[in-house]
Amino acid sequence: MMLSNISQTKAELLSGLGSSLTSSPGNVSAATMKLEAVMENLQRQHQQRMMEQHKNDDVISNDVRCDDFSDGGERQRSYSGSPKEDSDEDRNDMTSPMMRDDDDVMQSDGRSPEPDKTSLITQQMAFAAALAQRSSPDGSLSSLVPQAMMQHFGQFPASFDASQLPQGFRELAMLQHQHVAQRMAMEAQKRMQQDHNIQQSTNHIPTPSSASSHTSSGSVTSQTNSCNGSQQEWTYEEQFKQLYEIDDDIKRKEFLDDLFSFMQKRGTPVNRIPIMAKQVLDLYQLYRLVVEKGGLVEVINKKIWREITKGLNLPSSITSAAFTLRTQYMKYLYPFECEREKLSVPSELQAAIEGNRREGRRPSYSSHMFSYSPNTSANMLTPPKFPFAHHNGLAQLSQMAAAKYGQPDERCLPTSPTQQLIAQQQQLLQSANAQHVAAMAALETIQNQAKARQAAQQAAHHAAQQAAQHQMSLKKEIDSDYSEGEPPEKKLSFDDSVRRLTPDNQRRSSTSSLKISMGDRGRHNEMSDVTNADSINICVEVNGITYQGVLFAHSPNHPPVKHVTLDHPTS
């Protein structure tokens, strides 16, 4: 029912507009002037309403705009209504004599159109024309008005002319359209700015490789220097990206993922990639070359670092390339080699480094900077716990250590003051550690020598004690056999013989035969008169040889015996 009324109203509007255009020019001009006055009032009210809407920052949609036009049509109905039906309402709402004249003129036309529906549809047509003008490429209203009206308000004649719209309605629609267009343009610009900011932030966010899952600590900036001193800065993510994209080897990514995961689980995550010759050191290629040669210990013992350098395509002009490669390998790859390949153990590596040092090679600070544990591979290389004492001679110690042990040719020299201070402290620790190791080695040698001397002294003392005990036991046996009636001279001569058997006298007489001076009776025929009380049978063991003989006593009346020859020794 409502759709049929709207269609009928559209037809009446078109017929009314056509008849008004075909009528006399005077009536058309008078109606146009009065309609323009009404539209001026509507425009002022609309401007006030738009100011209120602008304060509230409400987004106006197409439906809201249609409702605004409907509200304007209702206000216009209050002006164009009959004085008999809405006389009280007209007196309260009309603000100028021109509004009352509008009612008289529209009543004098002799027609009785439906003013509410007519004004509503007229405003809708004006708004449709404004929409058509916005959509038109050349800004004209002639080509796209029928299509816009068909889209928004239903079927309209194809021959409809937009110039038939009153001037006031058209300006009102255009004013509202301009305001909405400005709001839409501002919102579109704001959205574009937001999209641009989001895109910039997305571009600045680094795209980490698969190894970034092992390092969630954020972006760590690593500033490095080349071997010639020229500075070159790469971020942590750029270094990882270069390391993963050196070549297209399929095993590279798998190896690097395993390496970083192992170091992370071990508690020593890789937070900096070493740089050599202005490029990232290829840890994968370095590991592969060293393992092919038999491991790090074999490379150190065979001194084939030059082949490793050629395999990495490093320039031969790099000084101390072997020292740098060995240091970096021990820091980043050797624990992984012990865990996966098991080509050597840390004790063998330490022995190889010490043997290389004895041959005159420069000492490696990293060989003593770590303590090794044979129980588990996870704690294979742990930082040392050396106390570092700060004193006034720190700079002098640093210079002496640098002059004696040399500076390691690092390709990743620090640039900031803090990093330089840390590097100096590390160098001082390295030199102090080397001196400490040398002092400990010398002390160990001295201790070993002292232990050897002490062991020899203990052995000699033990032998002397055994000899003394044996002599004492022999003396006790002799004393027990001849304790009764033994003359004092015999005891004295026996004490003298025992005194000769002391360790000092044994050493003196070890190379000569034993001769014992005794007294002699003078004549040989008188020997038969000697009784058993005048002689003693004696048995002496010297240096493992047993000597047996007879000792004769002498009296003051007889001359002393020149010498006594003992029996042949028995072993």
UniProtKB/Swiss-Prot annotation:
Comp. bias (Polar residues): 195-206
Keyword terms: DNA-binding, Nucleus, Transcription, Transcription regulation
Entry annotated with the keyword Hydrolase: no
Start and end residues of each REKLES domain: 473-558
Gene Ontology terms: biological process: regulation of transcription by RNA polymerase II
Gene Ontology MF: a single term: DNA binding
One term under GO cellular component: nucleus
Location of the ARID domain: 249-341
Protein's cellular compartments: Nucleus
Biased composition (Basic and acidic residues): 49-77, 487-507, 518-527
Superkingdom, taxonomy of origin: Eukaryota
Region (Disordered): 45-117, 190-229, 459-528
Biased composition (Low complexity): 207-224, 459-471
InterPro entries: ARI3A/B/C (IPR045147), ARID_dom (IPR001606), ARID_dom_sf (IPR036431), REKLES_domain (IPR023334)
Protein function: Transcription factor.
Protein name: Protein dead ringer homolog
